[in-house]
Swiss-Prot record:
It comes from Ehrlichia ruminantium (strain Gardel). It comes from the Bacteria. This is Argininosuccinate synthase. Its EC number is 6.3.4.5. Pathway: Amino-acid biosynthesis; L-arginine biosynthesis; L-arginine from L-ornithine and carbamoyl phosphate: step 2/3. GO terms for biological process: argininosuccinate metabolic process; L-arginine biosynthetic process; urea cycle. It is an enzyme of class 6 (ligase). GO terms for cellular component: cytoplasm. NCBIfam families: argG (TIGR00032), PRK00509.1 (NF001770). L-citrulline binds at residues 85, 90, 121, 125, 176, 185, 261, 273.
Length: 394
């Protein structure tokens, strides 16, 4: 191999991988860090890479692209995996993989590498993305190749090679954490026992509902063509809007979930997720659709959503079938305009109002107090008789 582009976070795993690649492949390693809202100090990451004699370091701000082209399209589908997971990690991998391949082409690299473990979903997501963007690229997955089979052995390797091992609040190696503008996930350590209650001091974006404000907060989110564009009438870019919702939702204990999910490779895993802004957006988007989308179309969306979510979770973002579903989902997005009013209180998101110039809601038809024009109560009798025919025993 001539040159390798490593997806580099500056954390323990990828710092060890960087050193390991240099030792075992005897070629230049380019590092690429995508700033997608993880709130890491990018200058520290650059210094870490430079300290390991890396000559080409790419640190790129991709927050707007991430939210605009990946998060928002996913939320147009009201996407949720297995009832709880808003796919915060899953949706970040396609963008990182795409840009990693672009950097490989730019620098003349013939291989890419990632830090995903051999037990997880991310190895699949990264590599599906690589092969969709460049079928001939060589892929190095150190966790499937080296003899460092546990986090303990990884830490020992790091210490022997003078690689800094970050410590958490109790002076121990931290949880396995993945963060971006959409969410933060925590895995490993005591969480590997699904019956043990989490130590919520781990949270960095949110207060727990018990510690959240005792005063409800009302906000309004404005939608245009299916995407949020403003909070309380203040226009915001996609990344800034999600950032603001994270701040607002975090102080009210919104979007903290403890789940056991089914990984694509067949293993069950437990994680704690913080998704304050995304949780608010999911409720708001469903609310604007409830008045702008007709019944059968809404039900169809609910039927295809699990398939769409499964495709993203399993790493199939770039596939034809995902793009086909996206086209179907986006077909009527021009109608999804309006404003949703939401109350936030101690972990709960309550939609308290919605309005749209494209609303299909009719007060005259829905009201018990008005004489409905165009609807005769007597018509319901025939409707019931016809639709009950199959229920009657012969």
């Amino acid at each position: 191999m001539k040159k390798i582009v490593l997806a580099y976070s500056g954390g323990l795993d990828t710092s060890v991988i960087l050193k390991w690649l240099q030792e075992n492949y005897n070629c230049e390693v380019v590092v690429f860090t995508a700033d997608i809202g993880q709130e890491d100090d990018m200058s520290v990451i650059q210094k870490k890479a430079a300290a390991l004699n890396v000559k080409e370091i790419f640190i790129e701000d991709l927050k707007e692209e991430f939210v605009r082209d990946f998060v928002f399209p996913m939320f147009r589908a009201n996407t949720i995996y297995e009832g709880y997971y808003l796919l915060g990690t899953s949706i970040a991998r396609p963008l990182i993989a795409k840009r990693q391949i672009e950097i490989a082409h730019l620098t003349g690299a013939d291989a890419v590498a990632h830090g995903a473990t051999g037990k997880g979903n991310d190895q699949v997501r990264f590599e599906f993305g690589y092969y969709c963007c460049d079928p001939n690229i060589k892929v190095i997955a150190p966790w499937r190749q080296w003899e460092l089979t546990s986090r303990h052995s990884l830490i020992e390797y790091a210490r022997k090679n003078n690689i800094n091992v970050p410590l958490d609040k109790v002076n121990e190696p931290p949880y396995s954490i993945d963060a971006n503008l959409l969410h933060i996930s925590y895995e490993g350590k005591s969480l590997e026992d699904p019956y043990v209650e989490p130590d919520y001091t781990m949270l960095s974006r949110s207060l727990t509902p018990e510690l959240a404000s005792s005063i409800p907060e009302y906000i309004e989110i404005t939608f245009e063509q299916g995407d949020p564009i403003a909070i309380n009438d203040i226009p915001l870019s996609p990344a800034n809007l999600l950032h603001q919702l994270n701040k607002i939702g975090g102080k009210h204990g919104i979007g903290i979930v403890d789940i056991v999910e089914n990984r694509y490779i067949g293993i069950k895993s437990r994680g704690i997720y913080e998704t304050p802004g995304g949780t608010i957006l999911l409720h708001a988007h469903r609310a604007i659709e409830s008045i702008t989308l007709d019944r059968e179309s809404a039900h169809l969306k609910d039927e295809i959503m699990p398939k769409y979510a499964k495709l993203i979770y399993n790493g199939y973002w770039w596939t034809t079938e995902r793009k086909m579903l996206q086209s179907l989902i986006d077909n009527h997005k021009k109608k999804f305009n309006g404003t949703v009013r939401i109350k936030l209180y101690k972990g709960s998101v309550v939609v308290v109002g919605r309005k749209s110039n494209n609303s299909l809601y009719s007060y005259n038809l829905a009201s018990f107090d008005s004489e409905s024009q165009g609807y005769d109560h007597k018509d319901a009798e025939g409707f019931i008789k016809v639709n009950s025919l199959r229920l009657k025993k012969s």
